[in-house]
Design a protein with these regions (language model features):
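C-terminal regions of RecA-like/P-loop NTPase motor modules
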Residues: 224-318
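A short beta-strand-to-loop transition that corresponds to the Sensor-1 phosphate-sensing loop
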Residues: 3, 217-221, 244-247
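P-loop NTPase motor domains
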Residues: 3-19, 23-212, 216, 225-228, ...
Length: 318
């Protein structure tokens, strides 16, 4: 997931699929596209993904927790939306869920009306990048989900949609003996949505069995370590790559990983670009990944704001 248009040039080099999401773009991922590990859809699969639907609605309702009445209305609408697709290759989408909520609301269910009102702008309005059927091309080597134009109110929904999409690709790859790698930039996006956090934690732990390797990236390690659930991401990770940090984050990592003075210095904000520290199963390794400016990859990874803006402007002008 690319939130800052940092991966498009790398994607171009590998001829990746690079769908762009957000207002004015046609790319769409169906956040309700799910199946079992063998590609089928059973009622148990719908039931097992209850947290996904709750997370979707809470993100649409600006993070407000659903009441018991709203949870019941949502469950009824979800089951009704999926029922025609059980055992079939087709899947419902958010427009179907919206339609079921409206139908229930017209029958007098006030909670369904509230849910439909919250969902409406994500189905019929400017935030509909995840409302319809999936229409993006999948590259077997690399896919860049470009999210730089996805607004703040859509970000949790975007994450849920991508996780669902990657889950299906991971199941398919597993059936063909292939591994799947997911780089999740700005993983702290979902920290304030408890159901979405549950989805992420389940995804992070369970999808390992199906050959998924997940790389979570954040510039806010303190936000991860201070979160009661997100801190478990650290506990269940075997490899850490730390780049130079601000002092507060540097101190936190030093305490947690018992860094020596020289290791601590490698994480200071003034350390050379491309250097840092790698921790693998407790073993600490100094990292020097500086790239020669003459190397073609130098400009691919160059995030200097002025140079990057010029590159992006030139690319958009083509």
């Amino acid at each position: 997931m690319d939130w800052h248009d940092e991966y498009w040039e790398l994607g171009d080099l590998f001829d990746a699929s690079e769908p762009q999401f957000g207002p004015g773009h046609d790319s769409c991922i169906n956040v309700m596209d799910m199946s079992g590990t063998m590609g089928d859809l059973a009622r148990r699969d719908v039931q097992a993904n209850a947290d996904v639907f709750i997370a979707i609605m809470e993100s649409c309702m600006k993070g407000d927790s659903l009441t018991n009445a709203q949870l019941t209305a949502l469950d009824e609408a979800v089951r009704a939306a999926y029922e025609p697709h059980i055992g079939r290759p087709t899947r419902p989408d958010l427009t179907d869920l919206y339609r079921e909520l409206r139908r229930s609301g017209e029958a007098g269910n006030r909670s369904a009306v509230d849910l439909a009102d919250a969902l409406g702008v994500y189905v019929n309005g400017s935030f509909n990048s995840f409302a319809g059927q999936t229409n993006i091309e999948v590259n077997p080597l690399m896919n860049v989900y470009r999210m730089s134009e996805v607004g703040k109110n859509m970000r949790t929904l975007a994450v849920l949609a991508v996780l669902q999409h990657v889950r299906q690709r991971a199941y398919e790859n597993y059936r063909h003996g292939k591994q799947t790698y997911l780089v999740f930039e700005e993983c702290q996006i979902v920290f304030n949505n408890a159901p979405a956090m549950d989805v992420l934690m389940t995804f992070f732990s369970e999808m390992r069995k199906f050959g998924l390797k997940m790389i979570c990236v954040t510039q806010l390690p303190n936000a991860v370590l201070s979160h009661p659930d997100a801190s478990k991401l650290f506990e269940n990770s075997g490899i850490f790559v730390f780049l130079p940090q601000q002092a507060q984050n540097q101190d936190t990592l030093a305490r947690m990983f018992k860094l020596s003075d020289s290791q601590y210095d490698r994480l200071s904000a003034g350390a050379p670009k491309g250097t840092g520290l790698v921790v693998v199963d407790g073993l600490k390794i100094a990292m020097n990944n500086r790239i020669d400016p003459k190397n073609p990859l130098y400009e691919v990874w160059n995030t200097d704001p002025d140079k990057y803006a010029a590159k992006l402007k030139a690319a958009r002008a083509v």
